[in-house]
UniProtKB/Swiss-Prot annotation:
Specifically methylates the guanine in position 1835 (m2G1835) of 23S rRNA. Gene3D superfamilies: Vaccinia Virus protein VP39 (3.40.50.150). This is Ribosomal RNA large subunit methyltransferase G. InterPro entries: DNA_methylase_N6_adenine_CS (IPR002052), rRNA_m2G-MeTrfase_RlmG (IPR017237), RsmC/RlmG (IPR046977), SAM-dependent_MTases_sf (IPR029063), Small_mtfrase_dom (IPR007848). One of its GO terms (molecular function) is 23S rRNA (guanine(1835)-N(2))-methyltransferase activity. It comes from Escherichia coli (strain SMS-3-5 / SECEC). Belongs to the methyltransferase superfamily. RlmG family. Its EC number is 2.1.1.174. The keyword Cytoplasm applies.
Length: 378
């Protein structure tokens, strides 16, 4: 846990999933402090919109203003709810919207934590363009190293005149005034042909490797299991290309597409609808934190390309949680398949959790591993 003192309230905040006690990662950053400082002497009129509030620092601080928390991360929503409870703040004080929803009209203040991907930022700025006014105070913040010329140009192009502040504690802010500059419409998704198939893959803004097949997925697809039955999970499904391939290779199986990103799940659904519509009755689509709340001993197989970062921080906490959830939800003799960068050494992590691990394939960058849930159902 970490403490954030600001002009609105003193907060105790924690990350979600929780990090280990040896190397704890902080649940807020200097950009959060810097953003809140700008509102110290501001009379807030109209709705408050907060975008990409990773662990709820801004939402908790501004809870008395009934803010809208907007983003593309279910884990961030869970983190915000947990930190509201931790600080004795009514959860209903914050209203949660995903980035594909319509934003509230005529906001008084918009606070933006600049996301990792420029595509997501553009989608969010275009959505804001439909609701902000010249009187809306628009402030974005991030580590100074993460604000580039392209970031500022995007604000200018979509919303209007943009300036940046001096760095403070290695953070920098962007101030923007809306003046409705001319803007060409942009498609909601980016599409490309999947090599070796007649499929067209459609990606929403925040999907990993948006403009083509990432090399890890390409390697994984060469080693996917075939002729499975029962339920299979594409965990952390992204655009669903792994699950789509599983549907094709395992015609007797049902595939459950799971991701914490609403845009990823929407992309997966769209890709099944447009490429294998006849398989929709063998699909389930789930926005979730890994397999939280899913009953144990349910699945025959889980396939996963786990992330090794959360927002801008490098961490294996999300991967660890995925592995533990997979073990709990697999049937006896059910199998977990993962692809990962070789340097992450997930072989020993899986062996610790499952008691076994087998290398299926490897190249100079990636490894495909399999672990089996052994033992008896109790």
């Amino acid at each position: 846990m970490s403490h954030l003192d600001n002009g609105f309230r003193s907060l105790t905040l924690q990350r979600f999933p929780a990090t280990d006690d040896v190397n704890p990662l902080q649940a807020w950053e200097a950009a959060d402090e810097y953003l809140l400082q700008q509102l110290d002497d501001t009379e807030i009129r109209g709705p408050v919109l907060i975008l990409n509030d990773a662990f709820g620092a801004l939402s908790c601080a501004l809870a008395e203003h009934k803010p809208y928390s907007i983003g593309d991360s279910y884990i961030s929503e869970l983190a915000t709810r947990e930190n509201l409870r931790l600080n004795g703040i009514d959860e209903s004080s914050v209203k949660f919207l995903d980035s594909t929803a319509d934003y509230p009209q005529q906001p008084g203040v918009v606070l933006i934590k600049v996301p990792k991907t420029l595509a997501l930022l553009e989608q969010q700025l275009r959505a804001l363009r439909k609701v902000v006014t010249p009187d809306t105070r628009i402030i974005a913040g991030a580590k100074a190293r993460d604000i580039h010329t392209s970031t500022l140009e995007l604000f200018e192009k979509v919303l209007g005149p943009t300036t940046t502040t001096l760095a403070w504690k290695k953070a920098r802010l962007i101030n923007c005034t809306f003046n409705e500059p001319p803007l060409v419409d942009a498609p909601q998704t980016v599409s490309w042909k999947l090599e070796g198939t007649d499929w067209t893959i459609h990606n929403h803004a925040n999907v990993f490797s948006r403009t083509g097949l990432d090399i890890g997925a390409r390697f994984f697809m060469q080693h996917l299991p075939e002729n499975l039955e029962g339920e299979i999970v594409d965990l952390g499904c992204g655009n669903g290309v792994i699950g789509l391939t599983l549907l094709d290779k395992n015609p007797q199986a049902k595939v459950v597409f799971v991701d914490e990103s609403p845009m990823a799940v929407a992309s997966s659904r769209l890709n099944v609808e447009t490429n294998m519509p006849e398989a929709l009755d063998r699909c389930e689509f789930m926005i979730n934190n890994a397999l939280s709340g899913v009953e144990p001993f349910r699945f025959n197989a889980v396939l996963c390309n786990p992330p090794f970062h959360q927002q801008h921080a490098l961490t294996d906490n999300v991967a660890w949680e995925m592995f533990h959830h997979a073990r709990r939800c697999l049937k006896i003799n059910g199998e977990l398949y993962i692809v990962a960068n070789r340097h992450l050494d997930y072989f020993h992590k899986l062996k610790k959790i499952f008691g076994n691990c087998t290398t299926i394939a490897t190249n100079n960058k990636f490894v495909v591993l399999k672990a089996v849930k052994l033992g008896r159902r109790r």
